[in-house]
């Protein structure tokens, strides 16, 4: 199986939760799974993690590359049909950065409409509810 791992930057407050991403990678590696981390190539507000105040804008794809293991791809360049399942680690960045993203909604909709597995953690579950309400 090929897995798509959706990242929203790097850091719990304005991106993907690093611990959840690393544990996802560890589990996929343990079982020899093929996976591709993806993020959208857009700039969004970031958070100063020392003060929790809004900071400068940062590019989500570039930030996600910090934990992308050299495999990170722009989600606009990915053919969702080539993947068997979607994994969404948590992090507040999902809720903030991808609130109005057409390509992210298209991605999630593809996996759900094709009845492919979608796994979400923590804020990833709330993220899915924004698109699909309680119909999950």
Predicted regions located by residue number:
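Conserved, well-structured core segments that form or line functional sites
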Residues: 115-118
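Short, thiol/selenol-centered motifs that function as redox-active sites or metal-ligating centers
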Residues: 121-122
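Extended, subdomain-level signal for the structured scaffold at the beginning of enzyme domains
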Residues: 1-113, 126-136
């Amino acid at each position: 199986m090929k897995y798509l791992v959706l990242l929203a930057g790097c850091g719990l407050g304005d991106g993907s939760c690093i611990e959840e991403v690393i544990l996802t990678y560890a589990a996929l590696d343990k079982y020899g799974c093929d996976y591709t981390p993806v993020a959208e190539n857009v700039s969004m507000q970031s958070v100063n993690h020392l003060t929790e105040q809004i900071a400068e804008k940062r590019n989500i794809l570039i930030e996600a590359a910090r934990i992308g293991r050299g495999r990170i791809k722009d989600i606009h360049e990915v053919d969702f049909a080539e993947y068997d399942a979607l994994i969404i680690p948590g992090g507040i960045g999902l809720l903030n950065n991808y609130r109005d993203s057409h390509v992210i909604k298209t991605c999630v909709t593809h996996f759900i409409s094709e009845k492919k597995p979608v796994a979400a953690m923590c804020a990833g579950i709330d993220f899915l509810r924004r698109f699909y309400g309680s119909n999950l």
